[in-house]
Amino acid sequence: MSEAGYRMYEKSVGSGKRFAFSCDTAELKHYLSRRKASLEKVRENFEPLWKEIRLYFEPNFGKALLGNSDRDQSASTRDDEKILNSEPRQCVHRYSAGMQSGITNKAQPWCSIVPKLIDEEESADPELNKWCNNATTEILSALERANFYRVSQNVYPHAALFGTSAILILRGEEPGDIHFHLIDEGDYWISCDRYGQVNTLMRRVSMTLDQAREEFFWENLPESWRNQIKEGKLEERVEVMNLICPNDGSEKFKDIDKSRAYASIYWLDKQGGAENNGILDISSFSYKPFAVLRQMDSGAVYGKGLGEMSLPDCKELQKLEEYLLRMIANEAEPAMIAPSSMKGQPINMFPGGVTFYDGMMQSGAAPVGRLFQTQEGIDKVDIKIRDIASRIGSIWYNDLFAMMLQVNTANRNQKTATEVAELSAEKVTLLGPVLTQMDEFLTSVIDGVFRILIEDGAIGEPPEVLMSGDADISVEYTSTIHAEMRAALKMRAINMLIEMTTMLAPAKPGALDKIDEDHIIDTVCKVYPGAAAFVKKTSEVMKIREARSREQQQAIANQQLAEMMKNAGANAKALSETHIGNGNALEAVMGGAA
């Protein structure tokens, strides 16, 4: 049964319009309150840092940390007073654009379902290959139909700023439809299992009364909400809590079938009265309905991000920017010094203005002048600001994305192929730890989408070899950055081998005998599939080599024949010049032969 169908089944088993919960709602509400307090206690240690990060980098993120339940009001309020230099803010969005285009680029396939644990020298079962290709196509199509790419471009900056980012993976109304929802920082709490994997997510949901009416049973809504809905106040916002956790099959989850993997409970934290003790809805999922990205694993529940790493530099940058603006203002409208005798007299500082002064001019100096000079200080502060901005950009990998662009365009004409490969490899490998964390997040996304499509029948039945356990499947990431990293590692080894062999060859010519040039070319074609179009087939190469071998053998034979003819002529001449009796040696030989 599909997720939507299962949810409708769960809701239909009640009497009338109210869901007849089988569990003890009072006990469940007590459990939820304790769970909420426990999760909040863990996260409150991180909140001061997150609040500071958002103010210095991107105040539009983490609005939920302000505690304002009216999200429309908080979204319309500016709180970017601490940002005088927008470079850190731009770094965040450049990073987001770089990761989106390099990892989850909608314009090209960035993942594929592949057979697992099959030897590279052997080919997978043709039926399994066909099924994997179909699964890949369906997954990428579902992601494109959904709002995944709009959500993912915000996942990257959230995780980079705060260290952690979370999304929901929800089934749509129609089979095969999927909806993704980004949860803003401050609106969710998480917990991990013993393996360090996030398995519990609690979130605070701000929704309009119209949305609440669509989401929950009418009779389960508080009476005050129902009255407001009847009055047409559909845009009034309310706040509910939602806990998504593994279904342990206990009494508190009595309303959920034990075969379901995850339980989801909506409840009112501060109200609810006698109506089911504030429990609004109990539902379930057959898959993990959320994915969490932790930028850097710090050993804690929540990750560490680039925002924390670059926060000291960002603070210093804003402070220096304030100094610079003040100095520029002093340069434009400088503090002045004048003799006390001019106190109370007007000074005309406009262009062409005249100020009358009755005192004596000393040493040719003007009676009114600047109190101090600021130009030299402006230059020094400006240089320091650029230096700090460059450091922040490096932390946010902006120089890496710029370098990758330059390596592939203008600078390519100024560098050798080896230099380009080495430079590209050096830069891309810096993203290795980041990609490891990204893969964990993306695997959760692909797994959720895959399970939904399987249950909805969008992906056909798995082949027998997969059902029997003789083979398995896995996700392979083929994005630009993933491919570049794999290529960089392989090409570095190939280039090192060729370089070392070339160095040894002059002293030890036999070293070249160890090199299999055909295998090197084939490996490079696997690393860069586009290059295969310019490489001849093995059969054609064999014909060319055979023809070349015949030509070389013929040339050697002709040379040997020429040498023999040359030697024969020289010998004949020598014999003819050797006198024997009345003749010469050549005549004697020819006569003897006769």
Feature annotation, model-predicted:
Residues M1-K41, F57-E58, A64, M336-A594:
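C-terminal anchoring/interaction modules
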Residues A124-R171, Y302-A338, Q373-Q406, E419-L453:
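Long, contiguous amphipathic alpha-helices that act as assembly "spine/axial" helices in icosahedral shell
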Residues F57-N85, Y156, I229-R260, F356-T374:
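An N-terminal domain-start capping segment
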